[in-house]
Every structure is written in C-alpha cells, then in structure tokens.
C-alpha cells in the first residue's frame, strides 16, 4: 500500500475510533493529514472509496495480528486463533468494524478472511465442494457475532432497574461474553470436524 494512502487511511480510522463513523468526512480526514479535501482524491478517491479503504485496512490489521506464526499449528488452533483475532479487532475498532459486515466485498484485501478460512477448512480435511459454504457460514458468525457485541445488538441479561451500575457486574458480563464466544468457537470446530470424512490431526 502506498505510504501516503496508508497515512490517510490510518488517520481516517483513528478519526472513526475517536468520534464514530458519522464524523468521518473527506474534510475531517484532510484536516488530520494537513491536506485539502480535493488533495485526498488521488490517494483514496471519494468517501465511498475511503470507506472501502478502511475495510482494506482492517483486513490488513487482522492479517498482521494473526501473522504467519500459526502455520506450524493444527487447524483447530488456527481456527480458534483466527476467531479470537476477529473479536479483538472488533473491540479495538468498534465504530469501524461493522464495515466488514456491511461492505464485505470492498478493499483489495477484503478476501483475506475468507481465504484464511478456506485454507483452514482444507487442512481440516473438509471436502472441496463443502468448503465455500462452511467458510461463508463461519465468516458470517465471526463478523455477525462480534458486530452485535460491539454495537450492543446482542441480547444480554437485563440489569436490575433499581440497582446502580456495578463495575464488577460489567466485568463479569464481559467475561461471560468471552466465555460464550469461546464456546461457540468450540462448537464450530466440532462442526468442521464432523464435515470432514477423515478429520485431520491437530498437527496436520
């Protein structure tokens, strides 16, 4: 990615992190990088293209966070690590993250997550004909669950209306959410294993 384009996208993402997606405009981003709005166009195009660029940047960040270190691990651990990386990305960029669900085909790196999932499913021994469907299903869960989590769209246990906010209760809720997500990942791993006629060993 061009250095100037990367700088602009980094600043656009920082703006969204600080002030929300509604605050992002060409003018606001231009001010952060010391340019005019028109000067952004050669690097990121218009606002729609800028949003696509944010999707690209988020996928790049996800790929970097997972890295190549998992290549030596089995498919189960790789799927678990990928799921947790998606969730960490959602919590790091809660305002921008829903773009991955709403603009899933955008950006030059937008196929990274699907490609990573397909590689894991292949290594698990899933038949080639079943890989696209399973990859879409797992991708939909990872992006849908985490988007709901950071936007407040997931159902949660209602607090006692007569109780004051309890930080300990909030921490417990966060821990329960994490445990639920890990349990869901375990269920997905079991589903993948059942989809493979001869499931690969963890070290495969």
Q: Which residue stretches match the model-derived regions?
A:
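Actinobacteria-biased recognition of intrinsically disordered, low-complexity terminal regions
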Residues: 1-7, 13, 68, 197-204
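Helix-turn-helix
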Residues: 7, 11, 15-49, 53
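Short hydrophobic clusters on alpha-helical segments that form packing/core surfaces
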Residues: 8-16, 54, 58, 86, ...
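Alpha-helical DNA-contacting segments of helix-turn-helix folds
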Residues: 16, 51-58, 104, 109, ...
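Hydrophobic alpha-helical connector segments
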Residues: 64-103, 109, 128, 138
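A contiguous pocket-lining binding segment that forms or flanks enzyme active sites
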Residues: 113-146
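C-terminal peripheral helix-coil segments that are non-catalytic and often amphipathic
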Residues: 123, 151-204
